[in-house]
């Protein structure tokens, strides 16, 4: 099947980076000085950035100044979503010490979901306003039959992303910074991790950086009150709306 061939080629392309990152995680101890767990977090993030940017070269998504579109075949999207959830589980297993510090929920699960939805609405509203201000075009809406698959993929993939940037990175930063400043720093670093995608992989430039900084800071603030569940919903639903062509 062409889909399986394409997926195999993608996995083969990211395997060298995976092996180097795995070797680093084996070499860097899980415990000891405070800076050591943070170094492990950056290794996880670096692998994520490499794997994400490789999706562009394999035609799995297209990023434009006014939106994004997942162009991978449905079977590949399903596989990538499942792999994202597998990476969530394996990362939690590898980082067992850091996992215990993660804020998974807010005070109440329902409130976490509500704040996650509010965060997504805020990200979408800010993105819509900026697009109107700078006259950026929107992509055409996708077929309704694709929406369930897009929603599932967006939530799964961005759950992994939020685990790295909020559950691990932001939570580690709380050892040195107040909650809001840690959210700001994690959001800015999140945007910075899209710089190569913005300037080299796609050459879209500033729109990607502006959107991802907004997205990262909002998700970071949501994490402070609603935990990883809320942050994942805010991020995942915003990406879903963008990929669906609704923004």
Task: Give names to the regions the model predicted.
Residues 1-98, 243, 247:
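N-terminal, membrane-interfacial amphipathic/helix-forming hydrophobic leader that caps
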Residues 4, 61-81, 86-158, 175:
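Juxtamembrane helix-loop-helix connectors linking adjacent transmembrane helices
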Residues 10-19, 23, 125-247:
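Transmembrane helix-loop-helix hairpins at the membrane interface
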């Amino acid at each position: 099947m062409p889909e399986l061939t394409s997926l195999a080629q993608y996995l083969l392309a990211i395997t060298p980076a995976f092996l180097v990152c795995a070797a680093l995680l084996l070499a860097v101890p899980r415990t000891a000085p405070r800076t050591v767990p943070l170094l492990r977090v950056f290794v996880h993030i670096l692998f994520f950035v490499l794997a994400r940017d490789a999706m562009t070269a394999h035609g799995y998504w297209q990023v434009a100044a006014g939106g994004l579109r997942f162009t991978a075949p449905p079977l590949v999207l399903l596989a990538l979503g499942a792999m994202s959830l597998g990476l969530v589980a394996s990362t939690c297993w590898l980082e067992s010490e850091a996992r215990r510090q993660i804020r998974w929920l807010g005070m109440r699960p329902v409130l976490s979901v509500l704040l996650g939805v509010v965060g997504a609405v805020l990200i979408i509203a800010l993105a819509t306003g900026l697009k109107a201000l700078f006259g950026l075009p929107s992509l055409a809406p996708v077929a309704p039959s694709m929406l369930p698959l897009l929603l599932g993929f967006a939530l799964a993939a961005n759950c992994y992303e939020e685990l790295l940037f909020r559950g691990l990175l932001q939570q580690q930063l709380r050892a040195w910074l107040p909650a809001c400043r840690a959210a700001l720093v994690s959001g800015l670093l999140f945007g910075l991790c899209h710089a190569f995608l913005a300037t080299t992989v796609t050459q879209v430039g500033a729109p990607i950086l502006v959107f991802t900084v907004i997205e990262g800071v909002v998700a970071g603030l949501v994490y402070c009150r609603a935990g990883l569940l809320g942050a994942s919903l805010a991020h995942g639903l915003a990406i879903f709306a963008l990929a669906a062509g609704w923004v």
